[in-house]
Amino acid sequence: MRLIRLYIDEPLNEGSKVLVKNDSFHYLAKVLKAKKNQKIILFNNTGFDFHGHIKNVTDRYFEIHLDKRFFLEKNMYTTEIAFSICKNPCSDFIIKKLTELGINSFQPLISKFSIFNKKKIDLEKKLKHWKNISISSSEQSERSYLPIIKNTISFQDYIDSCSSVSKIILNTKSQNMINNVYNSRTESCSVLVGPEGDFSDEEYSYAKQSDFSSVSLGDNILRVETAAIAAISYIKIINSNENK
């Protein structure tokens, strides 16, 4: 049986004890039904996995003793997805699935055709919601580092500030397939995916002026979340193959 993995936002030390309370306590007790003496792994976004066991259980907290720690190195290359905010569950699905695929960072965008209402969407609350999704997905997919979820910015600001070595914008009208552009690992890669209404011609042109390569994922018209998953999956395969 797989060990429980739990993210803890506090310092952890080998040989010490941790009291798991509040939401994490509820998750362990009610959802995972964790028991005394059960083995568990805690991580806190430092690269260390702390292997321990549940030493004591009360009605308010789990007391966990940390027995050993193991360090997992970060990849030397990074991948970022920049996506126009879309209707839920689209955005949530992108955060969840790309976290599982090992994405390093998310950059939410507002573009010309983004389905976005500032009066109805609390961006700070949305950011916190996405972080919770990424934590849950990191626990499930055995990541030791959480992805970075950046503050929402405009399409133009992103284009102006992007400094990745490889810069890709998905475009259904492009004659250039993604494998013709990205076929070997680079130090950093950013993938730009548009909203349900696509990017405007002006936005595609602006991205091209800043050295973004326009690529296609094939003949089919894909949903935003499908396109994001397909592109990042392909890049992950290319990057992973060069590790062998």
What are these regions (language model features)?
Residues 73-166:
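RNA substrate-binding interface of SAM-dependent RNA methyltransferases
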Residues 1-71:
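N-terminal positively charged helical leader segments and presequences
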Residues 11, 69, 110-113, 219:
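Short, ordered loop/turn segments at secondary-structure junctions
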Residues 40, 64, 146-150, 214:
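Generic structural signal for residues in well-ordered beta-strands
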Residues 18-20, 76-80, 187-190, 209-217:
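Glycine/charged-rich beta-loop-alpha catalytic/anionic-binding loops adjacent to active sites
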Residues 165-204, 212-215:
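Active-site/ligand-binding-proximal alpha/beta "capping" segment
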Residues 201-244:
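Structured adenosyl-cofactor binding patch, chiefly the S-adenosyl-L-methionine
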